[in-house]
Each structure stands twice: as C-alpha cells, then as structure tokens.
C-alpha cells in the first residue's frame, strides 16, 4: 500500500489550485482524476473558444492574483460591457431598455446597485430573488432587472441571499467588468498543471475513486494511505462514493444547474451583419447571443430549462 501526505481527488481547476497552494509546504501530493485530462469544466476547444467556463471577472480576487503570479496579465482581453437587449421584437440599448419599461433609473448600474445593497428585514433565504424583489420594487423595475440579467437560475431559482452574493461577487452587476484570456481560459489550468508537475507532484489520470476509509482511499487501480485528503469534485461524484451515503439528505439540498453553449461559424463575405455585433440578451430561447470573433458567434448561451430544451432536441 502506497503512502502519501496529501491526496487530492479531482484535477479540475479547484484540484489544481489546491495542489498549487499546498505545494508551498509539501510536494508529497498525488492527484487522482477519473478522466484523461486536467481542467475540469474549464476547457478551450483547439485554443479557439471556451466550451466550459467562458469569462472571468476582475472582482474575483483569487483569479486575479493567480493571473498575476503566472504573469498572464498581457493575455487579458476586456469584454465590452455594452449590450443590446432584444425585447418584444425590438432591439434596444441600455437606455432604450430603461425607457421601454418607463424606469425611474438613469442606468442599469444605478438600478442594480440599489437592489443588491437594499437593507431588508426579511429572511432572504426564505425567498427566491424574484419574489424578494416583489417585496420592495415596482413591477416595471423588476421587468428591467429580468431582461437585463437574462439568467433564469439566479432570478427564479436561487434564494435571495445567495443570488445577491452571486450577483455582487461573480456577476458584478454594478460594474460589469469582465474579461477573457487570449487563447482561452484553459491557459490558467495549464499554468497550474505545469507548475505542479515541475514540483514532481503526481497526477493519475483515468483513475476512479471507489471509496474512502479513515486513513486510505480505494481506487479502481490500488489502495493509497493518506494523512490529508481533499475532494475537489462535483455533487454527482460525491453521492457516488459509499462513504458519503449517510449524508445523502444534505447533498439532496444542493441542485446542479444547466448551462449550454451553441456556436456557429459564418462566412464573413455573406454575413455583413456580424460586423460590430454586440452581446445581446434576448427574451426568447436563444437567451444570449455572444460574438466571439469576427466570424464565430455563440448563437445561444442558455441556462436552466432553456438549456434542457436545447439539449433534448
């Protein structure tokens, strides 16, 4: 039986980052990964477009710190914060959207800032974000918030407390300051992977965790003793491990959301409409239209039941 100081299950960005941080104090680390690649949900297809995670925010402090540590600042490409909104068969800009619903706010930033900083005496975990908005916002302003956000999950599924945290920290609805990395977000996971490999940290691909015991794990290849064990996996992986069966009720309180990207590549000579195309939030099943390059467009980016709809066609 092998002995390791640290075992990490999962070679996605969370597992790689865990190994990176722990390597400052020990390199006696082994990562096991069930698939044949690292990066998890961060995956850039042929260095052209991101199939998984698609953007990063400058409010994500750990991400920004990591980019600086790996000297990747020169690869940052800021995303144009200006969007169009396709509502009731009309293409509107920000001011057009506000005017369409007779909003009392001068900008979406002002509206979102008021909402996420509003002090309420309600227990926010007892309301969806949409229901919570109804407790203090006029219907016309809620419509603007719905149409400008575009996402179903954050508006209708999350409790208000989690939604506000997500909207402030991840969605940055006040500043809308996002970026991509030239060459794809996989550059970040590649940098982490190359670093830990340079420290002689072992990554076992195509290795499935079968069960966890008090001082060892069992994989489909071998049994390994550990001093410390870290799991960087998704809910589905947790509930498949016998060790966690007693905690099934707790895991069942967590739901996993759906996201789907549909890409299309166009001949620029025949599709002049692509020129200067802005990111567009729609009120139909396309949900989001996001230009990637001059000839590559994400013709639909959807979540929740709309993502399920496209997946079942």
Tell me what each language-model feature is.
Residues 14, 37, 236:
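Conserved Rossmann-like nucleotide-cofactor binding loop
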Residues 7-9, 32, 209, 217, ...:
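Short hydrophobic core segments
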Residues 4-31:
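N-terminal Rossmann-like FAD-binding beta1-loop-alpha1 element of flavoenzymes
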Residues 233-313:
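C-terminal segments that line or cap access tunnels to active or ligand-binding sites in enzymes
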Residues 116-207, 215, 232, 237-242:
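Active-site/ligand-binding neighborhood in enzyme catalytic cores
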Residues 63-85, 121, 139-148, 271-278:
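A short alpha-helix-loop-beta-strand transition element characteristic
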Residues 23-46:
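Glycine-rich FAD pyrophosphate-binding loop
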Residues 48-114:
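Dinucleotide-binding Rossmann-like beta1-alpha1 core, especially the glycine-rich loop
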């Amino acid at each position: 039986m092998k002995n390791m100081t640290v075992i990490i299950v999962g070679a996605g960005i969370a597992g790689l980052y865990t190994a990176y941080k722990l390597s400052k104090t020990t390199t006696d680390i082994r990562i096991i990964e069930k698939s044949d690649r690292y990066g998890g949900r961060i995956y850039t297809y042929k260095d052209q477009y991101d199939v998984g995670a698609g953007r990063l925010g400058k409010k994500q402090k750990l991400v920004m710190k990591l980019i600086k540590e790996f000297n990747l600042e020169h690869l940052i490409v800021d995303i144009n914060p200006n969007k169009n909104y396709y509502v009731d068969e009309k293409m509107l800009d920000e001011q057009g959207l506000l005017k369409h619903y007779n909003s009392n706010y001068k900008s979406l930033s002002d509206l979102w800032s008021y909402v996420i900083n509003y002090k309420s005496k309600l227990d926010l975990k007892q309301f969806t974000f949409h229901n919570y908005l109804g407790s203090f916002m006029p219907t016309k302003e809620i419509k603007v918030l719905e149409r400008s956000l575009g996402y179903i999950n954050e508006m209708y599924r999350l409790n208000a407390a989690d939604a506000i945290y997500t909207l402030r920290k991840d969605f940055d609805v006040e500043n809308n300051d996002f970026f991509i990395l030239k060459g794809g977000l996989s550059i970040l996971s590649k940098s982490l992977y190359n670093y830990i490999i340079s420290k002689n940290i072992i990554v076992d691909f195509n290795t499935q965790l079968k069960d966890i015991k008090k001082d060892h794990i069992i994989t489909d290849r071998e049994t390994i003793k550990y001093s410390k064990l870290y799991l960087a996996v998704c809910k589905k992986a947790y509930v498949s491990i016998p060790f966690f069966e007693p905690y099934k009720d707790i895991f069942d309180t967590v739901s996993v959301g759906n996201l789907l990207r549909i890409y299309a590549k166009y001949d620029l000579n025949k599709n002049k409409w692509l020129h200067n195309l802005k990111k567009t939030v729609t009120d139909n099943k396309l949900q989001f239209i996001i230009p990637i390059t001059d000839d590559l467009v994400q013709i639909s980016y959807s979540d929740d039941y709309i993502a399920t709809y496209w997946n079942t066609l």
